Amino acid sequence: MPDTLTVIDNRTGKKYEIPIQYGTYPRYGAAIPTTDFRQIKVSDDDFGLLGYDPAFTNTASCRSSITHIDGERGILRYRGYPIEDLAVNSSFLEVAFLIVHGMLPTRTELDEWSYDITHHAIVHENIKKFMDGFRYDAHPMGILISTVAALSTFYPEAKRIRDVEIRNEQIHRLIAKIPTIAAFAYRHSQGFPYTYPDNGLGYCGNFLSMMYKMTEKYTPDPVLEKALDVVFILHVDHEQNCSANAMRSVGSSLPDPYVSVAAAAAGLYGPLHGGANEQVLHMLQEIGHISRVPAYIKKVKQGDIRLMGFGHRVYKNYDPRAKILKEMTHRVLGVTEKNTLLDVAVELERIALEDDYFVNRQLYPNVDFYSGLIYQAMGFPLEMFPVLFAIPRTVGWLAQWAEMLDDPEQKIARPRQIYTGDDVCQYVPIEDR
């Protein structure tokens, strides 16, 4: 007999058996189909019970085989592969193939995939004209969101999302063009001429070239190129977060992927999602020196200020991505100018992890704690931080979108509500109000 949950409605005395469903890990993935609660009624004309879960803190909106997170034990896996293994042994484009296709590629498959991505990086000249229309001080993330949405008008065939070949073509285009658009957005804000993609460079090296190349050929530093590759791997996907949910929700109405990615990027734009590492840098700059860390910690414990870069909605342990980024930060600063903020960050982490106040509250460093230091060391301005998040996360969004389209259980997203407004009101003419 399958596992069930027995529910007794004290309003009627009736008993109901609700089936329990499991994912790969029963201890982590048990769920109840909330639609089964519709049968629980006081009378036949009763709508039935709804599940009330603001912000979806305990609601599984889909079945997914892309990313597994065990927040209690600090585990993150892409398609079953530990993030630590991929960060050391893989590359961003190989991980992108894994995320999109569900398996690691053969050498031939990886070569073909890399070639296709590389040779789709160029954008239409009219896209450049479109981007020229933004103010000189427009935020790069706003430019990115608008430009990705505009791509929809350049590829009208993209609306045929049930055609797998056409769908895959759009996936290639988006993964390839996002770095180009991101670099163009930066150069627009600086008043620099746009730099075209260089097919002789890798994915991350090409992005760095489009960002920083002037008149001479740009050769990326191998340490910085590898560091960016690892940072991108760590940001590819993270289960059903705000932006992934936006991608699925908008995508469920079956538009082309360009507008869905634009919607997901808009979700990422908010400071609670894609802007957290910028807030970490502001905090470290405010502290300024390791000697001021104890006083700052005291203010945090008094509730006067927040400790940025610590704690996570899912992780109740050390974020595995933060461990990798901590080591990578030291490598990056070994080839760039030394940043005293790293000393502040390390001391802040040390004190916090030894303090029962933070340990008891399960506040550990998250991915944003060190990523901002890496970006800053590589010369990226603060306003580019959410853009740098969007580049690799586009891969995850597209994988989530494709998985949703192939899932027969999925429908157009349409959550319910509990109405708390007035009952029937009588209209009053404006003269009598």
Positions of predicted regions on the chain:
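Non-transmembrane, aqueous-exposed alpha-helical and coiled segments at domain scale
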Residues: 1-433
